């Protein structure tokens, strides 16, 4: 839902969060939803994640895929990972947090979602941190536990203004921790 409602505001330095229209006429799913579904399908059907990512994304080419990811998609077969540390690995890792039965399995599944393209250590870390936050929330841990075991563990100097994929990870986990609504 957040991905769909956020599409009209992507790449805009939006400040008036209270004025976001959740029913904006330009709401649509993005590349992040396509990749998220591809990873979930791969896990649920026992398929290769890289193949599923490539097939799903090529079947839905008009999403806002990043340049490195588009280059990866355009190569024949399954191309090697390109060492990305952007936010794509975090954006598609949620199924690992939902489907894992243990913390170790969550880390393993999240790593698998990152590796086809985001094999840089920071790319993997972003996927793992995202999935673990979801895993902990799904298993009843409170926000302080998530802060301690995700933000403080993976990003001890976190703030909302860092670079790379972890910028998004620290921002969305930080927002989750600070909100009164969840």
List the predicted regions and their residue ranges.
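Structured, active/binding-site neighborhoods that engage oxygen-rich ligands
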Residues: 1-182
């Amino acid at each position: 839902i957040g991905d769909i409602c956020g599409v009209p505001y992507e790449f805009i330095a939006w400040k008036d969060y209270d004025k976001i229209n959740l029913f904006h006429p330009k709401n649509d799913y993005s590349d992040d939803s396509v990749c998220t579904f591809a990873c979930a399908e791969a896990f649920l059907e026992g398929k290769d994640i890289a193949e599923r990512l490539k097939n799903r994304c090529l079947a839905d080419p008009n999403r806002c895929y990043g340049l490195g990811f588009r280059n990866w998609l355009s190569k024949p077969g399954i191309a090697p990972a390109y060492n990305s540390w952007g936010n794509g690995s975090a954006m598609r890792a949620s199924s690992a947090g939902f489907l894992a039965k243990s913390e170790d399995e969550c880390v393993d599944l999240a790593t698998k979602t990152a590796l086809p393209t985001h094999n840089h250590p920071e790319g993997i870390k972003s996927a793992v941190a995202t999935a673990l936050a979801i895993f902990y929330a799904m298993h009843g841990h409170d926000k302080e536990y998530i802060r301690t075991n995700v933000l403080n563990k993976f990003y001890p100097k976190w703030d909302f203004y860092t670079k790379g994929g972890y910028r998004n990870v620290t921002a969305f986990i930080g927002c989750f921790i600070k909100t009164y609504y969840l």
